[in-house]
């Protein structure tokens, strides 16, 4: 095999609790990463020799700083032959939306090139490389909906009943660094067990602050909560979502969206397509 076409899926944080802060400044979290059947698409075609190429280039991102390129570079020391690769990106997910676009692209690249270049790295090794690229990359390498703790690196795969989600994209870019460094952020939520979340749910500890700082997010949530009172923000935003028991209901609500609020409907899945490509050990 010398080529692969893969979905690079989005994720949602079904809840996000900040339970503390380590001495090094990193926040301790609890969250449930829900993978979706919607995302970007990446096509990889191996070259017998030559460089790593990516098309199209993202105009706002330096080539070498693109997470796709950084992931490919991280694997280069492990490839047994001097192979290159041409990568084509079909971008559907917004940048800075809190739904994991860049992190998912990096994870998809790690898993795909480990397979195509025959690098022979284990899933754990790929996750370790991924963590160097971003805190959310390991969950996409893991390729399973998962309960996460610590700084997001402790992952417990979890199977939950399928839901349909309407994800809405407010017209703003939320700075994760700004939110996590803000003095008003809640950092002392009590830790909960999986069973407690499944019974009673949770909240997003970043949401109150983001709604105050970004009126576009507040507006989008106010609109969505007409249809789902549990609608909430994912990650540090800006995207927000509502869940439904049927695709028909999700699509109907999508048709009611105001013209200035784009959105998409996706199904929650317990595994992404990457799962079948992961090494056995």
UniProtKB/Swiss-Prot annotation:
It is an enzyme of class 2 (transferase). The active site is at 11, 136. It holds the Pfam family GHMP_kinases_C. GO terms for molecular function: 4-(cytidine 5'-diphospho)-2-C-methyl-D-erythritol kinase activity; ATP binding. GO terms for biological process: isopentenyl diphosphate biosynthetic process, methylerythritol 4-phosphate pathway; terpenoid biosynthetic process. ATP binds at residues 94-104. Its EC number is 2.7.1.148. The keyword Protein transport does not apply. Pathway: Isoprenoid biosynthesis; isopentenyl diphosphate biosynthesis via DXP pathway; isopentenyl diphosphate from 1-deoxy-D-xylulose 5-phosphate: step 3/6. Keywords: ATP-binding, Isoprene biosynthesis, Kinase, Nucleotide-binding, Transferase. Belongs to the GHMP kinase family. IspE subfamily. HAMAP family: IspE. This is 4-diphosphocytidyl-2-C-methyl-D-erythritol kinase. The gene is ispE.
